[in-house]
A protein has these predicted regions:
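Long, contiguous binding/interaction regions
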Residues: 1-23, 28-162
Length: 162
């Protein structure tokens, strides 16, 4: 469905929810407002879709996890620790020749953190993809009784869809 409509998926996460019969899929993608509306309408028609809705980026919480392994030695270890401290990243592994950082934050924070490593040798990196919830109480779409909806949940947040 996404490929046929020409959408480029930036991020896709799937997770369990407090309801064991429901999985939550969060898709981050770019497209025109018209194309996003069309995608929402078509996804609603899928048999497995319980709900689909757009989260306003200004009214939602978005987070992503980055694991980053960087080559290091005695000469650059202090500088790498300083970058880690500025971004509040955790050093979760340290060896004589590498450091592994863990950073949780908004995608733009992750991007900015990664830009700080352009002069260092990145050995490995892995990003989880964005997951999101609406701020405050229960999202208005989540208040529908289960019998009024079908069988799975596909939240599709904002134009940046996180």
């Amino acid at each position: 469905l996404f490929c046929r409509r020409g959408f480029n998926i930036d991020s896709l996460t799937v997770s369990a929810t407090n309801d064991p019969s429901v999985s939550r899929i969060t898709v981050t993608l770019r497209g025109t407002e018209q194309a996003l509306n069309q995608l929402i309408l078509q996804t609603e028609r899928l048999e497995v879709t319980r709900q689909i809705f757009e989260l306003d980026p200004d009214k939602s919480l978005q987070r992503e996890l980055l694991l980053l392994k960087v080559a290091c030695d005695a000469g650059n270890r202090a500088a790498l620790r300083e970058i880690s401290s500025i971004y509040k990243a955790k050093i979760i592994d340290l060896s004589p020749d590498s450091m592994v950082f863990e950073l949780i934050g908004k995608p733009d924070k992750i991007d900015a953190f990664l830009k700080m490593f352009t002069d260092y040798k990145i050995l490995e990196q892995c990003r989880t993809g964005v997951t999101a919830l609406e701020r405050g109480g229960m999202h208005q779409h989540m208040q529908k009784p289960p019998q009024q909806v079908r069988s799975a949940q596909l939240p599709l947040p904002g134009t940046n869809c996180a």
